[in-house]
């Protein structure tokens, strides 16, 4: 299988085609470090010049900044790209007649947005919250229609003991109904979830007719539980998948002995050992581990595209090289024979 970043693939039943490689925009919001307007523009242009025509954003990214940046770039292009953004968080502030709920405890793994806009996020998965989020994203992006909406970070990973409250807002409170109405009216082409846990997508399929979902970090060379437990269900229900987090927080893109982070924390010994064995086999076949990590999810028929998040034009170009690297079938056969993939 030889991949091209610009290759167009059908996105389930949405009628959309997305490039096999998509660009996530979270870093443009100042994730981990500030990003200037000039650097953000250069990064987006490099993605476009590389043939990428699928871009993902969210109100959360830079508290609205990323949607502004992305819309400003795409509105100037002669060719229409596919855009996905998210619902579930509103960007707001206190004002006369409105008092916001207390801010949730800060996640110690969240370094914040270093040059985001001066807003505060408030979770709202209800009918009115979803509709307002859609309206706000239309204005920030500058497009009257948005191709895809993902319900952002619903689930226990984000909400812990508040999960049931937010789940009820999404289900009984009309969040899914709002998304269904937007799809029926042609305001969006499809919707699904954008999350870090496949189990909540499985649960959501019992509540709504999802078209496409974004799953981060849960289908990779180091985590394949979803391949047996979830991907067949996605195929059966006709729901396409976009996979993000293919490097599992960096360990699969780092050189041997380099960064040892897995799922935003220090990698446990068994993950380090598995990664070292992957390095051994990659060296044998002269394949960069990062290239294998990027291409692996697309070997499954349920997956339409993968998303990358980068901080510079150089990183985009390097990712495209990895993505388009020729990998022999024997390499994958060896991984399978050693139980590293199924």
Swiss-Prot record:
Activity relative to temperature: Optimum temperature is 30 degrees Celsius.
EC number: 1.1.1.107
Active site per the UniProt annotation: 56, 61 (proton donor), 86
pH dependence of function: Optimum pH is 8.0 with pyridoxal as substrate (9.5 with L-fucose as substrate).
GO molecular function: pyridoxal 4-dehydrogenase activity
Description of how the protein assembles with itself and partners: Homodimer.
Protein name: Pyridoxal 4-dehydrogenase
Annotated organism of origin: Microbacterium luteolum
């Amino acid at each position: 299988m030889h991949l091209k970043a610009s290759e167009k693939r059908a996105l389930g039943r949405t009628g959309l085609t997305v490039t096999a490689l998509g660009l996530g925009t979270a870093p443009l919001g100042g994730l981990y470090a500030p990003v200037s307007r000039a650097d953000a523009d250069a990064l987006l242009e490099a993605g476009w010049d590389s043939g990428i025509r699928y871009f993902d954003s969210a109100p959360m990214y830079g508290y609205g900044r990323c949607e502004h940046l992305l819309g400003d770039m795409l509105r100037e292009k002669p060719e229409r790209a596919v855009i996905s953004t998210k619902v579930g968080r509103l960007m707001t502030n206190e004002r006369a007649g409105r008092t916001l709920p207390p801010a949730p405890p800060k996640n110690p793994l969240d370094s914040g947005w270093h040059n985001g806009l001066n807003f505060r996020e408030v979770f709202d998965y209800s009918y009115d919250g979803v509709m307002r989020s859609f309206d706000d994203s239309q204005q920030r992006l500058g497009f009257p229609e948005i191709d895809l909406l993902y319900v952002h970070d619903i689930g226990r990973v984000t909400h812990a003991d508040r999960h049931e409250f937010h789940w009820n807002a999404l289900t009984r409170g009309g969040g899914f109904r709002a998304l269904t109405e937007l799809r029926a009216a042609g305001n969006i082409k499809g919707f699904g979830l954008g999350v870090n846990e496949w189990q909540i997508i499985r649960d959501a399929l019992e509540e709504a007719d999802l078209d496409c979902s974004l799953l981060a970090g849960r289908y990779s060379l180091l985590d394949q539980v979803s391949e047996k437990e979830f991907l067949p269900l996605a195929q059966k229900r006709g729901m396409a998948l976009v996979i993000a987090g293919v490097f599992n927080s960096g360990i699969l893109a780092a050189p041997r002995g380099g960064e040892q982070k897995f799922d935003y924390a220090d990698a446990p010994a068994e993950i380090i050992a598995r990664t070292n064995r992957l390095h051994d086999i990659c060296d044998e076949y002269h394949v960069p581990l990062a290239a294998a990590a990027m291409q692996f999810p697309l070997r499954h028929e349920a997956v339409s595209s993968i998303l990358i998040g980068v901080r510079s034009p150089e990183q985009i170009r390097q990712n495209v090289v990895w993505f388009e690297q020729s990998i022999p079938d024997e390499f994958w056969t060896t991984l399978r024979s050693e139980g590293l993939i199924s």
